[in-house]
UniProtKB/Swiss-Prot annotation:
Function: Catalyzes the reversible interconversion of serine and glycine with a modified folate serving as the one-carbon carrier. Also exhibits a pteridine-independent aldolase activity toward beta-hydroxyamino acids, producing glycine and aldehydes, via a retro-aldol mechanism.
Domain of life: Archaea
Leader sequence segment: none
Gene Ontology CC entries for this record: cytoplasm
Pathway recorded for this protein: Amino-acid biosynthesis; glycine biosynthesis; glycine from L-serine: step 1/1
Organism: Nitrosopumilus maritimus (strain SCM1)
Pfam families to which the protein is assigned, alphabetical: SHMT
Name used for this protein in its record: Serine hydroxymethyltransferase
Length: 440
């Protein structure tokens, strides 16, 4: 009896995996923190590398059996440094959060202060306070001070930040780390405008490029390391179209502190198969990244304009809505972000609810925030352009503004998706973007 139940669970797992792939073949994926890897990246990720251990730095491993792993990891580091014009790269962090922790560990101690964007102003939970279960506070014990934020311009307020830093110094709360970047990231952050000032107070400047890494690689966003950031952290699977993982970049002087923080501090083995997938993605980004990043930004602007024309309140209007892959929409005229997210999912349109400026003061929380966040990274990699952005905006209008039954749109959404089943901006794309690979 137990054996048959075990086999039933076994079969159920594979059935659900296949159902998921089929669902995404017929959906419009607009999660800003996601992308679709190429078949080549998927091949690297399912390799035997995933079964091996390679603790430490390549050439200095704790384990034997790493001859080819070392070769690939050296190549991965070389490609990462070339892609971002950096002198040092640590490709071992297994996520963007772990990459951030490496910087916290290398350049601060528990009880120190970090300056970062608040979550309603676009900050990521890994930059957050302990009382909010933020990684910086909960795991590393940092005290967090927030940048003053200009809600109209949707970016950090430079003058008020300078004033705040001076006040923090008077109160003996001068930050050790200044963190730029975030999860709601419409426009470049003022790294160039603030870096000299922050460094005059001996702050280590880190730029969390998780969301915009592919745009930076393509030369279509800001260049944080050139503008004054000491280090740059990122995840590798958003606008940079690799597997899930992390990366830390910097100059030679950052090598030893970051290496020690990453291992043995924060990783043992580091998901070596994903490291190989990162290397493939870096090569793809060097070859195709400029064209991809340019199309992403064109699509985001077209999408934002189409949504605005449809009657939505799109944030950042005074600056042209967006300069990244993201669009933020205030949906309070129709419902809240949680309800809109759920309604759109019924139509196979996948978005996420989003806290926006003003939500916390108004008593709204993450489950029922005032906005939704949309991203065009994945649909751009599927080959969509301006006309498709307008059509998707129409679908969203029908569900959210016109209150049409989402399930009645399913056939239209599925028909719309039929022509977009291959990954673009890559060397090889014989396999369908969401094609299920059976190995049994």
């Amino acid at each position: 009896m137990a054996k048959s139940q075990n086999k039933e669970s076994y079969n159920k797992i594979f059935a659900k995996l296949k159902e998921h792939h089929k669902w995404f073949e017929n959906s419009i994926p607009l999660i800003a923190s996601e992308n679709i890897p190429s078949p080549a990246v998927r091949e690297a990720v399912i390799s035997d590398f995933g079964n091996r251990y390679a603790e430490g730095w390549p050439g200095e491993r704790v384990y034997a059996g790493c001859i080819y792993i070392d070769d690939v990891e050296f190549e991965c580091m070389k490609l990462a440094k070339k892609l971002y014009k950096a002198k040092f790269a640590d490709v071992r962090p297994i996520s963007g959060v772990v990459a951030n922790l490496a910087v916290y560990s290398a350049y601060s101690n528990p009880g120190d202060v970090m300056l970062a964007p608040s979550i309603p102003a676009g900050g990521h939970i890994s930059h957050g306070k302990k009382e909010h279960s933020g990684t910086a506070g909960l795991v590393h014990g940092l005290e967090i001070e927030f940048y003053p934020f200009d809600a109209e311009e949707m970016t950090i307020d430079v003058d008020k930040t300078k004033q705040k830093v001076k006040e923090l110094k008077k109160n003996n709360r001068l930050p050790k780390i200044a963190m730029f970047g975030g999860s709601l990231f419409l426009f470049p952050h003022p790294v160039k405008e603030l870096s000299d000032f922050l460094k005059s107070y001996d702050m280590h400047i880190n730029y969390d490029a998780a969301h915009v890494a592919g745009l930076i690689a393509g030369g279509k966003f800001q260049d944080p390391l050139k503008e004054g950031a000491d280090t740059m952290t990122m995840s590798t699977h958003k606008t940079l179209f690799g597997p899930q993982g992390g990366l830390v970049l910097g100059s030679e002087k950052h090598e030893e502190p970051i290496k020690k923080a990453t291992f043995p501090g924060l990783t043992s083995s580091h998901h070596i198969n994903n490291m190989a997938g990162k290397a493939v993605a870096f090569a793809e980004a060097l070859e195709f990244g400029k064209d991809y990043a340019a199309q992403v930004i064109k699509n985001a602007k077209s999408f934002a304009e189409a949504l605005s024309d449809a009657g939505f309140k799109v944030l950042g209007e005074s600056r042209g809505f967006t300069q990244s892959h993201q669009i933020a929409v205030n949906v309070l005229d129709y419902s809240d972000g949680g309800k809109v997210e759920a309604d759109l999912e019924k139509a196979n349109i996948i978005v996420n609810r989003q806290l926006i400026p003003g939500d916390i003061k108004a008593g709204r929380n993450y489950f029922h925030p005032g906005g939704i966040r949309l991203g065009v990274s994945e649909i751009t990699r599927l080959g969509m352009k301006k006309n498709e952005m307008q059509e998707i905006a129409s679908f969203i209008k029908q569900v959210v503004i016109e209150k049409k039954d989402p399930k009645k749109l399913l056939s239209k959404v599925k028909s719309f998706r039929k022509n977009y089943q291959k990954v673009k901006f890559c060397f090889d794309n014989k396999l369908g973007a969401y094609e299920y690979v059976k190995l049994r």
